[in-house]
Amino acid sequence: MECPVMETGSLFTSGIKRHLKDKRISKTTKLNVSLASKIKTKILNNSSIFKISLKHNNRALAQALSREKENSRRITTEKMLLQKEVEKLNFENTFLRLKLNNLNKKLIDIEALMNNNLITAIEMSSLSEFHQSSFLLSASKKKRISKQCKLMRLPFARVPLTSNDDEDEDKEKMQCDNNIKSKTLPDIPSSGSTTQPLSTQDNSEVLFLKENNQNVYGLDDSEHISSIVDVPPRESHSHSDQSSKTSLMSEMRNAQSIGRRWEKPSPSNVTERKKRGSSWESNNLSADTPCATVLDKQHISSPELNCNNEINGHTNETNTEMQRNKQDLPGLSSESAREPNAECMNQIEDNDDFQLQKTVYDADMDLTASEVSKIVTVSTGIKKKSNKKTNEHGMKTFRKVKDSSSEKKRERSKRQFKNSSDVDIGEKIENRTERSDVLDGKRGAEDPGFIFNNEQLAQMNEQLAQVNELKKMTLQTGFEQGDRENVLCNKKEKRITNEQEETYSLSQSSGKFHQESKFDKGQNSLTCNKSKASRQTFVIHKLEKDNLLPNQKDKVTIYENLDVTNEFHTANLSTKDNGNLCDYGTHNILDLKKYVTDIQPSEQNESNINKLRKKVNRKTEIISGMNHMYEDNDKDVVHGLKKGNFFFKTQEDKEPISENIEVSKELQIPALSTRDNENQCDYRTQNVLGLQKQITNMYPVQQNESKVNKKLRQKVNRKTEIISEVNHLDNDKSIEYTVKSHSLFLTQKDKEIIPGNLEDPSEFETPALSTKDSGNLYDSEIQNVLGVKHGHDMQPACQNDSKIGKKPRLNVCQKSEIIPETNQIYENDNKGVHDLEKDNFFSLTPKDKETISENLQVTNEFQTVDLLIKDNGNLCDYDTQNILELKKYVTDRKSAEQNESKINKLRNKVNWKTEIISEMNQIYEDNDKDAHVQESYTKDLDFKVNKSKQKLECQDIINKHYMEVNSNEKESCDQILDSYKVVKKRKKESSCKAKNILTKAKNKLASQLTESSQTSISLESDLKHITSEADSDPGNPVELCKTQKQSTTTLNKKDLPFVEEIKEGECQVKKVNKMTSKSKKRKTSIDPSPESHEVMERILDSVQGKSTVSEQADKENNLENEKMVKNKPDFYTKAFRSLSEIHSPNIQDSSFDSVREGLVPLSVSSGKNVIIKENFALECSPAFQVSDDEHEKMNKMKFKVNRRTQKSGIGDRPLQDLSNTSFVSNNTAESENKSEDLSSERTSRRRRCTPFYFKEPSLRDKMRR
């Protein structure tokens, strides 16, 4: 019992242990799974968090990047703007520096010169005497003079005090203060703004400097005057304590300051004064006269440029005499000062009406300390003769009285400002040549102290009233007339425009003064009245004229009347209308009319063309006739074009032409080249009265370009014969004349009229006409012919290129009898055109041919143009000589007709080497006859096949051999090509002539025979002889068929080194049923005709019937062939010699020697290449022409077969000798020894080299593989 108990216990324990182990394992697995799942979940969570965070980060980064880019862009743009601003500022700074430097230099120079010349100027001014002229003064003016005189007696009193005019003086004080402020401002943008800090001494120095140095400082006049004008009153007293002279100068400065206070009410007057003074200073620099005037109150109304200019001019006139007068100033009495002051004030008030404002240089002269110093103004004026000055003064006063009708001076200044000032200026300028003793009024008007202000045109603020003439000193100025003219022209322009700028840059003012300094004195007399201003003429320079004319768009016409009466030189009319350019260069033209009936731009072209009518000094009757003719033509043309888009030349058009033909010798119309939508029609016609061109485009032509040949500008003598010259008629998509009918008709009536009008047809030429409408080409060139040629293409041909070239120069010598014949031709043309629209075929009517043949005899002197028309890639090229008329109807729908057109081109050429051809024919006939004599038994075989089948088979074989050209054969052909080439022709010529031979007859000889064909014939006779022997044996047909296969297998390209590819002589006839193989290694043709298949089936059946042929049969055939060749060695050697010596001298003699010595027929490569390639390279070559064609063709068939039987015995010999252009290999023994290995080579070479025409149709695909 224990044993089982123990067993059960052990089992129990073992089970428990297993259970525990399982539990542990399960726990561990669970833990592992849970851990893996936890890790996985953590990884997933982390990855998702990472993804999200990455997305956010990327988004934030992208936004930040975009912001940064925007900021960078903004910064770059700002940087660019700042750089531009910096550049501008730098430029301005440099400009201002340069300006400042120039001004400083000028001021330094002026100061130095004034210091040098001041004493002399004072001396000149002191010598002058004061003259009184108070009889012209009104009561109001006298009051003002008295007031001003009081003011002058007190030089240091800034504010004038009078019992009568207290209020007025208060107002004047305010104005004076404003003037002082404006003068002190440094930033006034006037030309003389930088010259304000000058002292009054400098001002006086400037004045006298200009007097003495007129020509030197012409440029700096504006600056000098402005500096003088703008001197502040503080500086006037700077040098009062020095010497008597300096005291006098200080008094003058004080007087100037006081006068300026009265003169200028606003600071703007300062700049105006500078500007005006500078402008007139340069004008009137030369011929200065000293004038000393007492400065009283000057009431200046709104200043104006002209007056101020004149004022400055007069101020510049003080010379060395002024200095003398100034020296005499201290001795002047107060009375003498008062009297001229009164006179001057009268004139000054008159000048209020005229608005004459001139700056006055005041010199305060202190005679004694107790005396009331007199303010003497030294003004410069142009000195002229005294007589004219007196007249000037009288004229001035008279007009001043006129203008001073009203007492309200300011109101009158508004109304009469321009007229009065201009009148006074003009009078003064006219009378500058003479200086009168009384210069009071003139000095007041000429003083440079007057300054014009545009802001106060309505007010006459102040006047200079004190001008004292210097009786003793009269200086004449040397102004040039050109300078004065420029001054006046500038004045008038300024008066007309009424535009005045307050500020002038110093450079502008100086430049203006230079220009004004070149005007003439004569025009200075221009008055200021508007009526006079309208009458005066301005000298407009060429630049101004050029600027005026181009402003007129598309209407520019320059009329130039030439004195040459015999020649008319018309201006080039350049008209641009919507991109349409019409350029007419015409020489010796009475009239040119161009009618462009475009929908949009036609009217403008007509308007521009009509402007070319010039004055004709001689033959005005002809002109009227021409105009009448053109008007009639215009009416007829426009009417016809609107209705039917046909162009009919009526009898009315012809009559004036016939009337004017006699005169047409002298005329020459331009070549009219019109390009419509890139369609160019170029016409060059000479000695034609009128050229009318109607272009009816249904769409707006926006790119018309009419280019005129400048070659036509030639001098044409009246009585000289003009050889007409027609240049190229380039119709690049030209659209002309007709839209619907596509034709241009000349009525019978017109044809009758024109011949009568042609009195001398040798001296004129009708224009070449080119018409293309919606792709229909009408191309014709008419030379001394009355008619129109028509070409109609029913298909749209948008790229027709009709080129007529070679510039035929025709000289028709009294052939008027041709004209009626040409009329008949053109009648036929019109008929042919209508037939052409219906039938659409290329034809020449027999009647036309007859007329052409008749005209060929008469027109040996004509030379027609080569008419080359290309329509849809179809080329029709006609090289015709001595033809009166050529009519061409082109209705090409297919590209195949291009070759026919090429053939027609070459039909007129004469065949070359007819002697060689006849000689070859004799050789062929001799060879054939000898072959028949020796091979009479071959006649039985000739008649076994029907003649029809023989013809077809022969054609098939010929067509097949045409296409056989191997690439390796091409390489080897170059060695012999030179020896066989006698006549080189193009492929086109050979192809066309070959095709003609095919169509006419095969018996006809080809126009070109290469030497290879000739040699092949002599060689062919040998092989025919062999074939005859082979055929005589009854067992040969079977063996021949078999050996044919064997021989073809050995014909590799490597085995065919002696193949000549006649590159230029080889031709392929079109429209022949042929299929070229796709393989490039062999180019063979397959003729699907049933007759050829029958021949091949016969051969193949014979081959399949007896598949096993012994090599002994091959050897026997070879021996028999050799024997038959030995029978007639002389004939063949002669044939070889004759051909080699005559036609192929380059052929190696060793090859022929081997033939004569060995008397072995040609090897496989030579036989095949010479016979097949050479004999059939030329299509339909007469190599087989014998008395009986059928006999020859059968011999040819058999010859090919036997040639391969011959190869079977000899084909295994090495062929490296053949690469050296040897016809026969001398290694015959080796070939016989290697004949055993022929069968092994046949299988390997069969697929590569066996021609398809010896295989069944089912095997063709296999062979291609």
Curated annotation (Swiss-Prot):
InterPro entries noted in UniProt: Shugoshin1/2
Source species, domain of life: Eukaryota
Annotated segments matching region Disordered: 161-202, 230-287, 305-339, 381-447, 499-526, 1073-1093, 1200-1265
Functional description taken from the UniProt entry: Cooperates with PPP2CA to protect centromeric cohesin from separase-mediated cleavage in oocytes specifically during meiosis I. Has a crucial role in protecting REC8 at centromeres from cleavage by separase. During meiosis, protects centromeric cohesion complexes until metaphase II/anaphase II transition, preventing premature release of meiosis-specific REC8 cohesin complexes from anaphase I centromeres. Is thus essential for an accurate gametogenesis. May act by targeting PPP2CA to centromeres, thus leading to cohesin dephosphorylation.
Biased composition, class Polar residues, residue ranges: 190-202, 305-322, 503-512, 1217-1230
Keyword presence, Coiled coil: yes
Keywords: Cell cycle, Cell division, Centromere, Chromosome, Chromosome partition, Coiled coil, Kinetochore, Meiosis, Nucleus, Phosphoprotein
Residue stretches of biased makeup (Basic residues): 1073-1083
Subunit note: Part of an astrin (SPAG5) -kinastrin (SKAP) complex containing KNSTRN, SPAG5, PLK1, DYNLL1 and SGO2. Interacts with CDCA8. Directly interacts with PPP2CA.
Annotated positions of the Phosphoserine modification: S1144
Biased composition annotated in UniProt, kind: Basic and acidic residues: 232-242, 389-410, 425-446, 1231-1243
Further details from the record: Shugoshin is Japanese for guardian spirit (as it is known to be a protector of centromeric cohesin).
Protein known as: Shugoshin 2
Coiled-coil ranges per UniProt: 69-116, 452-476, 603-626
BP-aspect Gene Ontology terms: cell division; chromosome segregation; meiotic cell cycle; meiotic sister chromatid cohesion
GO cellular component: chromosome, centromeric region; cytosol; kinetochore; mitotic cohesin complex; nuclear body; nucleoplasm
Subcellular location field: Nucleus; Chromosome, Centromere; Chromosome, Centromere, Kinetochore
Record organism: Homo sapiens (Human)
Membrane spanning stretches: none
Family: Belongs to the shugoshin family.
PANTHER family: SHUGOSHIN (PTHR21577), SHUGOSHIN 1-RELATED (PTHR21577:SF3)
